[in-house]
């Protein structure tokens, strides 16, 4: 049994961590691990058997930038719906890998609906509830055999909310015989890690190649998640899926996920992520995708859309116009990005600044590709615009927002070469 976790050594320049080397796993048209960029995934909350609602939500998540989407497969009706969902998405021109989330009865569902097994791009199996007692190994093997038959990858996802109780009891008993027993939390973390690793090795013994296995071991505490994944990363070369199992609602969920995942990502740990936010009433499910993208972008992992820097405001910025302009600019670049991604590759790396007064406005604007310094209280009613560090023009009047957005569009057209294809 592994007794200690060695914290990774930071790089000498303290700016970037080498990515952990893992097997590359092909999931539909997406590659996870093997040094590829960290992949964003999400999960629906529709009744999967409701094909129309599920297709609509998958499409929304995909348009927001989700590169894989997981759906609950908990009934025969849900399993039967999966091929129809895939077909309807294909008719819409959406080719996003769908992941089937199985608990308790996955072996029965795939036996009853083999078309589901073929249509899914990946299966998620929870080793804590795939079966109990003598049935566990048999039912786990049945699921792995479906993956082998249809050439599908599997995520073996352990979760401390549904931990393998037999394994936990065994490790607790072993711990009682230690000269220096671990605390209960450490034993449970070890049980979670062992559950994932032992199940992965069992899958390999059955015949599933290592490059078709992704692991996860989720908890809901920030420090626990960091400890679990550092250990899991040291003890295997499987691709890893990161995420808190229940991050929470609103800002708490965003902060908790960011606090945990940013540490691991900066250490080169993690090949795919999901931000498990509880949506607020009326809030779009796509929020979890946007947060995942922003987390990867702010930690320097990937670029999805131009970053907009804006000052927080103070007594010098009594006008709300700079706040309104920052919102307009952010919405504009998000709206334009799908087209820019095709026609102007590289535009996602552009940086923008919307500043509210003379204190930091000109300096911050010079650091951006395009920046505007709006007048603060008592300042001259003029807004200088800087392009690549040089003052280009001063905007005045009622149309500053429209004029600044037009300058952004012009910059993209001139700077990022149009892809004629």
UniProtKB/Swiss-Prot annotation:
GO biological process, one term: terpenoid biosynthetic process
Enzyme class: oxidoreductase
Cofactor(s), names only, from the UniProt record: [4Fe-4S] cluster
One Pfam family it belongs to: GcpE
Pathway membership, UniProt: Isoprenoid biosynthesis; isopentenyl diphosphate biosynthesis via DXP pathway; isopentenyl diphosphate from 1-deoxy-D-xylulose 5-phosphate: step 5/6
Keywords assigned: 4Fe-4S, Iron, Iron-sulfur, Isoprene biosynthesis, Metal-binding, Oxidoreductase
Catalyzed reactions per annotation: (2E)-4-hydroxy-3-methylbut-2-enyl diphosphate + oxidized [flavodoxin] + H2O + 2 H(+) = 2-C-methyl-D-erythritol 2,4-cyclic diphosphate + reduced [flavodoxin]
Region: Disordered, residue numbers: 1-20
Cofactor: how and how many bound: Binds 1 [4Fe-4S] cluster.
Residues binding [4Fe-4S] cluster: 311, 314, 357, 364
EC number: 1.17.7.3
GO terms of molecular function: 4 iron, 4 sulfur cluster binding; 4-hydroxy-3-methylbut-2-en-1-yl diphosphate synthase activity (ferredoxin); 4-hydroxy-3-methylbut-2-enyl-diphosphate synthase activity (flavodoxin); iron ion binding
PANTHER family reported in the protein's UniProt record: 4-HYDROXY-3-METHYLBUT-2-EN-1-YL DIPHOSPHATE SYNTHASE (PTHR30454), 4-HYDROXY-3-METHYLBUT-2-EN-1-YL DIPHOSPHATE SYNTHASE (FERREDOXIN), CHLOROPLASTIC (PTHR30454:SF0)
UniProt function note: Converts 2C-methyl-D-erythritol 2,4-cyclodiphosphate (ME-2,4cPP) into 1-hydroxy-2-methyl-2-(E)-butenyl 4-diphosphate.
Similarity section: Belongs to the IspG family.
Name the UniProt record assigns to this protein: 4-hydroxy-3-methylbut-2-en-1-yl diphosphate synthase (flavodoxin)
Native species: Stenotrophomonas maltophilia (strain R551-3)
